[in-house]
Swiss-Prot record:
Key component of innate and adaptive immunity. TLRs (Toll-like receptors) control host immune response against pathogens through recognition of molecular patterns specific to microorganisms. TLR9 is a nucleotide-sensing TLR which is activated by unmethylated cytidine-phosphate-guanosine (CpG) dinucleotides. Acts via MYD88 and TRAF6, leading to NF-kappa-B activation, cytokine secretion and the inflammatory response. Upon CpG stimulation, induces B-cell proliferation, activation, survival and antibody production. A lipid is attached at C258, C265 (S-palmitoyl cysteine). Disulfide bonds join C35-C45, C98-C110, C178-C184, C255-C268, C258-C265, C470-C500, C764-C790, C766-C809. This is Toll-like receptor 9. It comes from Equus caballus (Horse). Keywords: Cell membrane, Cytoplasm, Cytoplasmic vesicle, Disulfide bond, Endoplasmic reticulum, Endosome, Glycoprotein, Immunity, Inflammatory response, Innate immunity, Leucine-rich repeat, Lipoprotein, Lysosome, Membrane, Nucleus, Palmitate, Receptor, Repeat, Signal, Transmembrane, Transmembrane helix. Expressed in airway epithelium, vascular endothelium and inflammatory cells in blood vessels of the lungs (at protein level). Highly expressed in pulmonary intravascular macrophages (PIMs) and to a lesser extent in alveolar macrophages, neutrophiles, type-II alveolar epithelial cells and bronchial epithelial cells of the lungs (at protein level). High constitutive intracellular expression in leukocytes including polymorphonuclear leukocytes (PMNs), CD4 and CD8 T cells (at protein level). The keyword Transferase does not apply. DNA binds at residues 47-51, 72-77, 95-109, 132, 152, 179-181, 208, 262. Activated by proteolytic cleavage of the flexible loop between repeats LRR14 and LRR15 within the ectodomain. Cleavage requires UNC93B1. Proteolytically processed by first removing the majority of the ectodomain by either asparagine endopeptidase (AEP) or a cathepsin followed by a trimming event that is solely cathepsin mediated and required for optimal receptor signaling. Residues 26-817 are extracellular. Belongs to the Toll-like receptor family. The keyword Nucleotide-binding does not apply. Changing W47A: Significantly decreased binding to agonist CpG-DNA.
Length: 1031
C-alpha cells in the first residue's frame, strides 16, 4: 500500500487545491484579502506593505464597503480604476504611502503619481486623507467631498482652480507643507480668493506653512481657522474682516518664546507681535481663542472686547508673569470656561509669591484654570483669593511650580473644586498660615538652572481592574512627585470632603500608625505608591472609615531590609476596602501569615516573591485564604516555577479572575481548576509552558477567558478545550504552534467569540487542515488575513496563510525529483545523437590520443620534475620575518591552496642533517623551480642571503634561467637601486607586502603567479627579452 499511497498523494493534493479554489469562488475565504473587513463597512489594509491598491474579487460584497484605509503602505501610483469597483465608498485613507524626503525615515525622495480620474471615479466619496504623501498639486476631486486632508505634502500653492467644484467641502487641512521637518525654502502661497468658492467650508487649518500674513478673501462661512506656528507677527482687523462666523481661532506660535521650545525655533522680532486693539472685536461668535507661544508681555483689554461668547482662552508659553497679577483683561469674559496660563514664567527665575489680579474674579463661568509652570514657591490664601468667588471652578492645575510651601487648607473656600493638581512641586510638609503681601515681583527671587526645568518621570498607570480611577469622584488632590518625607494630619485640616488623594513618587518613609489622615473622613482612594512606607503598625489607615482603594505598590525598600517584620493585619480593620495593591514590593518573608478581609474585591500582589514564601512549608500556604470576598487576584511576576493543587486550593473560592503572567511556570495542573469553582478568567501569558498535554480543561469549569499567549507551546492534546463549554475567549498567540487543529475544541469551536492565533510559526503545507478550520471560525479570529502568518516553508515565512497560490500547491519534493529526472532524460536524448553526428570521429580520435599521451607525459614529468616549487630564503635572525614566513607564507601557499598547493623548501624543515651548509644550500637552489627572497631591508644583505643570491646568479649564467622572486616587507626598501632596476626589467618578480588588509588578497594571487610561471614571461619587452634557453 505504501507505493500506491505515495503515487496517489499528488492527486489528493490536487483535489484539495481544487476544493480550496471552489471555496474561494464561493466566498468562504476572507472576501477582501489581503485586507480585513471590520465592522461598519471598513476594509482595513493598514501596514501591509502594499505597492498597489488591491483589487477585490467580484464575489466580495464590494457594495457594502463604505471606508477603505490604506495607511502606511508603499503605494506610489494611483490608477483611474483603483477605486471604481467600490461604488459606495465614502471614506478613503491614503496617509503615509509616499512621504516627502524630509518626513521619510531614511530621507528618500518620493513622488506619488495620481491619474486624472482616480477619485472622480468614486462619486460617493466624502472623506479623503492624502497627508504624508509626495504630491505637488491638488488632484481632481469629486464634488461630493466633505473632508480633505492634504497635510505634510509638497503642495505649496493654492489658486482658484485648485479646489474648483468642491461646493460640499466643509473640512480642509493643509498643515506642515513647509516647515523644519518638511522644508521647502519658501512659504505656502494662497492666492487671494483661492478658497472663496468653497461656500460651505467651516474648518480650515494651515498650520506650519511659513505664512507671513493671513490669506485674503477667506470664505465667510469659516467657523474654525487654525494658523498656528507660522510667521504671522502682525494682526489687524482687516485680516479677519469678513469672518464673522468664526467660533475657534488659533494664531499661537507665530512669534515664539524660544527658551521653552521643544523644536527648532525662530526668535520673535523686537516689539512684536503687533495685535491691533480691534483685531477680534467683530468676532462676536468666537468661542475659542489660542494665543499661546506668542511672546506676549501684556494683555490689552480691548482685544477681548465684544467676545462675550468666548469659552476657551489659551495664553500659555508667553511672558505674562507680571501681567496676571494686575491685568483687567478678564473683566468682560463672563462666559469663559477654560483658561490656560501655563509656562508664563520669568526666564531662570522663581518668585517667592504670586497674587492673581482681581479681574480673575470676573470669570464667573470658569471651570478649568491651568497655571502650571509659572514658578512661584509659596501657595497661600492670598495667591488664589480672586478665584474663591468663582462658583463654577472645578479643575485647578498648579503642577511644576517649585512650590515648597502650600497651605492646603485654603481649598476649603472652593466648594466647587473637583480636581487640584499640585504634582511635580517641592512640597515637604504642612506650613503655618502666614500673611503674604506684594506682587509677583516682590519677595526674594531664586535663579533656576536648566536641571530644575527638567520634567519628572511619568507615573505608571494602574489597571482599573485592580485600582479604580478618581475621575468620577467629587474632590481629588494630587500631591505626587513632591518632597514629602512624612505625612502630618495638619496638612489636610479642613479638607474633610476630599475623596481621592495621590501621594505617589514622594519619599515618605514613616511608619503609618492610624493618625496621619485623621481629617480625611470622606477619603475613598489613597495612592501611596513609589514611596518607602513602613507597614509595622496593625492600625495603619484605620482612621479612614470610607477608604475603598489603597495603592501601596512600589514601597519595596522596607521589605528589602533583612530581619525587619511587616504587619499586614490592618487590612482586616478596613471595613469598606475594595481595592488593594501591594504590587512590586519584593515581599518574601517576615510578613503576616494571612491576609484577612470580608470586603476586599481586588488584590494586586504582582512583583513580589511568592515562590520564596510558599517554599517555607505551610507558613504562608493560607496567605490569601482569609480574603472571603476576593474576586480578582494578580500574582504576576512572582517567580513561580510550579503551582501545586494545594496552593490553588487555598486561594479564595470566590475568585473570578486570576493573573499569573510573566512567571516561570512550565507545568500547570489543569484539573485543579475545579478547586476554584467561580473562576472565569485565567491569565497565564508570558510563562514557559511547552505543551497543553497533561489532561484537559475540566468539565463543569466556569472558565470564559483563557490567555496562554507568549509561552512556548508546540503541542495541544486533542479535546483539551472541549469540556470547557463556557469558554468564549482564547488567546494562543506568540507561541510555537505549527498548526491549529479542530480536534482541540470539539463542539466548542462554534461558540468561541475570540480565538487569537497570531504570531505562531504555522506550517503552510499543501492541504494544511488549520486553513479550513480558521475559515470556519474566521469571525472569531482577530486579524486573520494579515496577522496570522506562516512560519514555514521558507518561501512563505512571514507571509499571510492565504498568500500561497493554489495552482502551485503540489508536493514540492516530488516536483523537484520529477523535474530533475525529466531534464536529465531530455538532455541525454538530445546530446548523444547530436554529438555522434557532428563530431563522432573527432571525439574518438581525441580519446585515443589522450590515452597515448597521458602515460608518456607522466614519464616525462617524472624525469624533469624538481623537488620543490620554491626555495624560501630569509634572515632567521629577524624574528618578525621568520614569523611571517612560517605562519603566513607557508600556510597560504601549502595549506590553503588545496589541489594547487606549492612545495616550499625551508631551511629548518627540509635541510638534511649531517650535510654541510653549502651542500644543503646547493641542493636547495638546484632542486627548486624558483628562489623566493623574503627581505625586510635591502641595504644590508649578508650571510646565507648573500650566498643564495650569488648561487641564483650562477644558475642564471649556467642554465640561463632567472629564478629570483623578491618579497619585500618594508616600504623603505624601495630606495634600493637593484630593486628599482629589477622593477623596471621584470616587475612581476618584485612584490611588496601591502599596508592595507584589503590588498592582501591581490598580493597572494600575484605571488602564486610569480612562483608558477617562468620569469622570462615577465620581462619588459621594451628593454630586453629576458634569458633564453641555449639551443
Amino acid at each position: 500500500m505504501g507505493p500506491c499511497h505515495g503515487a496517489l498523494q499528488p492527486l489528493s493534493l490536487l483535489v484539495q487545491a481544487a476544493m480550496l479554489a471552489v471555496a474561494l469562488a464561493q466566498g468562504t475565504l476572507p472576501p477582501f484579502l489581503p485586507c480585513e473587513l471590520q465592522p461598519h463597512g471598513l476594509v482595513n489594509c493598514n501596514w501591509l506593505f502594499l505597492k498597489s491598491v488591491p483589487h477585490f474579487s467580484a464575489a466580495a460584497p464590494r457594495d457594502n464597503v463604505t471606508s477603505l484605509s490604506l495607511l502606511s503602505n508603499r503605494i506610489h501610483h494611483l490608477h483611474d480604476s483603483d477605486f471604481a469597483q467600490l461604488s459606495n465608498l465614502q471614506k478613503l485613507n491614503l496617509k503615509w504611502n509616499c512621504p516627502p524626503a524630509g518626513l521619510s525615515p531614511m530621507h528618500f525622495p518620493c513622488h506619488m503619481t495620481i491619474e486624472p480620474n482616480t477619485f472622480l471615479a468614486v462619486p460617493t466619496l466624502e472623506e479623503l486623507n492624502l497627508s504624508y504623501n509626495g504630491i505637488t498639486t491638488v488632484p481632481a476631486l469629486p464634488s461630493s467631498l466633505v473632508s480633505l486632508i492634504l497635510s505634510r505634502t509638497n503642495i505649496l500653492q493654492l489658486d482658484p482652480t485648485s479646489l474648483t467644484g468642491l461646493h460640499a467641502l466643509r473640512f480642509l487641512y493643509m498643515d506642515g507643507n513647509c516647515y523644519y521637518k518638511n522644508p521647502c525654502g519658501r512659504a505656502l502661497e494662497v492666492a487671494p480668493g483661492a478658497l472663496l468658492g468653497l461656500g460651505n467650508l467651516t474648518h480650515l487649518s494651515l498650520k506650519y506653512n511659513n505664512l507671513t500674513t493671513v490669506p485674503r478673501s477667506l470664505p465667510p462661512s469659516l467657523e474654525y481657522l487654525l494658523l498656528s506656528y507660522n510667521h504671522i507677527v502682525t494682526l489687524a482687523p482687516e485680516d479677519l474682516a469678513n469672518l464673522t462666523a468664526l467660533r475657534v481661532l488659533d494664531v499661537g506660535g507665530n512669534c515664539r518664546r524660544c527658551d521653552h521650545a521643544r523644536n527648532p525655533c525662530v526668535e520673535c522680532p523686537h516689539k512684536f507681535p503687533q495685535l491691533h486693539s480691534d483685531t477680534f472685536s467683530h468676532l462676536s461668535r468666537l468661542e475659542g481663542l489660542v494665543l499661546k507661544d506668542s511672546s506676549l508681555y501684556q494683555l490689552n483689554p480691548r482685544w477681548f472686547r465684544g467676545l462675550g461668547n468666548l469659552t476657551v482662552l489659551d495664553l500659555s508659553e508667553n511672558f505674562l508673569y507680571d501681567c496676571i497679577t494686575k491685568t483687567k483683561a478678564f473683566q468682560g469674559l463672563a462666559q469663559l470656561r477654560r483658561l490656560n496660563l501655563s509656562f508664563n514664567y520669568h526666564k531662570k527665575v522663581s518668585f517667592a509669591h504670586l497674587t492673581l489680579a482681581p479681574s480673575f474674579g470676573s470669570l464667573l463661568s470658569l471651570q478649568e484654570l491651568d497655571m502650571h509652570g509659572i514658578f512661584f514657591r509659596s501657595l497661600s490664601q492670598k495667591t488664589l483669593q480672586p478665584l474663591a468667588r468663582l462658583p463654577m471652578l472645578q479643575r485647578l492645575y498648579l503642577q511644576m511650580n517649585f512650590i515648597n510651601q502650600a497651605q492646603l487648607g485654603i481649598f476649603k473656600d472652593f466648594p466647587g473644586l473637583r480636581y487640584i493638581d499640585l504634582s511635580d512641586n517641592r512640597i515637604s510638609g504642612a506650613v503655618e498660615p502666614v500673611a503674604t503681601t506684594g506682587e509677583v515681583d516682590g519677595g526674594k527671587k531664586v535663579w533656576l538652572t536648566s536641571r530644575d526645568l527638567t520634567p519628572g518621570p511619568l507615573d505608571t498607570p494602574s489597571s482599573e481592574d485592580f485600582m479604580p480611577s478618581c475621575k468620577n469622584l467629587s474632590f481629588t488632590l494630587d500631591l505626587s512627585r513632591n518632597n514629602l518625607v512624612t505625612v502630618q494630619p495638619e496638612m489636610f485640616a479642613q479638607l474633610s470632603r476630599l475623596q481621592c488623594l495621590r501621594l505617589s513618587h514622594n519619599s515618605i518613609s514613616q511608619a503609618v500608625n492610624g493618625s496621619q489622615f485623621v481629617p480625611l473622613t470622606s477619603l475613598q482612594v489613597l495612592d501611596l505608591s513609589h514611596n518607602k512606607l513602613d507597614l509595622y503598625h496593625g492600625r495603619s489607615f484605620t482612621e479612614l472609615p470610607r477608604l475603598e482603594a489603597l495603592d501601596l505598590s512600589y514601597n519595596s525598600q522596607p521589605f528589602s531590609m533583612r530581619g525587619v517584620g511587616h504587619n499586614l493585619s490592618f487590612v482586616a480593620q478596613l471595613p469598606t476596602l475594595r481595592y488593594l495593591s501591594l504590587a512590586h514590593n519584593g515581599i518574601h518573608s517576615r510578613v503576616s501569615q494571612q491576609l484577612c478581609s470580608t470586603s476586599l474585591w481586588a488584590l494586586d500582589f504582582s512583583g513580589n516573591s511568592l515562590s520564596q514564601m510558599w517554599a517555607e512549608g505551610d507558613l504562608y500556604l493560607r496567605f490569601f485564604q482569609g480574603l472571603r470576598s476576593l474576586i480578582r487576584l494578580d500574582l504576576s511576576q512572582n517567580r513561580l516555577h510550579t503551582l501545586l493543587p494545594c496552593t490553588l486550593g487555598n486561594l479564595p473560592k470566590s475568585l473570578q479572575l486570576l493573573r499569573l503572567r510573566n512567571n516561570y511556570l512550565a507545568f500547570f495542573n489543569w484539573s485543579s481548576l475545579t478547586l476554584l469553582p467561580n473562576l472565569e478568567t485565567l491569565d497565564l501569558a508570558g510563562n514557559q509552558l511547552k505543551a497543553l498535554s497533561n489532561g484537559s480543561l475540566p468539565s463543569g469549569t466556569q472558565l470564559q477567558r483563557l490567555d496562554v499567549s507568549r509561552n512556548s507551546i508546540i503541542f495541544v492534546v486533542p479535546g483539551f478545550f472541549a469540556l470547557a463549554t463556557r469558554l468564549r475567549e482564547l488567546n494562543l498567540s506568540a507561541n510555537a504552534l505549527r498548526t491549529v487543529e479542530p480536534s482541540w475544541f470539539g463542539f466548542l469551536a462554534g461558540s468561541l467569540e475570540v480565538l487569537d492565533v497570531s504570531a505562531n510559526p504555522l506550517h503552510c503545507a499543501c492541504g494544511a487542515a488549520f486553513v479550513d478550520f480558521l475559515l470556519q471560525v474566521q469571525a472569531a479570529v482577530p486579524g486573520l488575513p494579515s496577522r496570522v502568518k506562516c512560519g514555514s516553508p521558507g518561501q512563505l515565512q512571514g507571509r499571510s496563510i492565504f498568500a500561497q497560490d493554489l495552482r502551485l500547491c503540489l508536493d514540492e519534493s516530488l516536483s523537484w525529483d520529477c523535474f530533475g529526472l525529466s531534464l536529465l532524460v531530455v538532455a541525454l536524448g538530445l546530446a548523444m545523437p547530436m554529438l555522434h553526428h557532428l563530431c563522432g570521429w573527432d571525439l574518438w580520435y581525441c580519446f585515443h590520443l589522450g590515452l597515448a599521451w597521458l602515460p608518456r607525459r607522466g614519464w616525462q614529468r617524472g624525469a624533469d620534475a624538481l623537488s620543490y616549487d620554491a626555495f624560501v630564503v630569509f634572515d632567521k635572525a629577524q624574528s618578525a620575518v621568520a614569523d611571517w614566513v612560517y605562519n603566513e607564507l607557508r600556510v597560504r601557499l601549502e595549506e590553503r591552496r588545496g589541489r594547487r598547493a606549492l612545495r616550499l623548501c625551508l631551511e629548518e624543515r627540509d635541510w638534511l642533517p649531517g650535510k654541510t651548509l653549502f651542500e644543503n644550500l646547493w641542493a636547495s637552489v638546484y632542486s627548486s623551480r624558483k628562489m623566493l627572497f623574503v627581505l625586510a631591508h635591502t641595504d644590508q644583505v649578508s650571510g646565507l642571503l648573500r650566498a643564495s643570491f650569488l648561487l641564483a646568479q650562477q644558475r642564471l649564467l649556467e642554465d640561463r634561467k632567472d629564478v629570483v622572486v623578491l618579497v619585500i616587507l618594508s616600504p623603505d626598501a624601495r630606495r634600493s637601486r637593484y630593486v628599482r632596476l629589477r622593477q623596471r626589467l621584470c616587475r612581476q618578480s618584485v612584490l611588496f607586502w601591502p599596508h592595507q588588509p584589503s590588498g592582501q588578497r591581490s598580493f597572494w594571487a600575484q605571488l602564486g603567479m610569480a612562483l608558477t610561471r617562468d620569469n622570462r614571461h615577465f620581462y619588459n619587452q621594451n628593454f630586453c627579452r629576458g634569458p633564453t634557453m641555449a639551443e
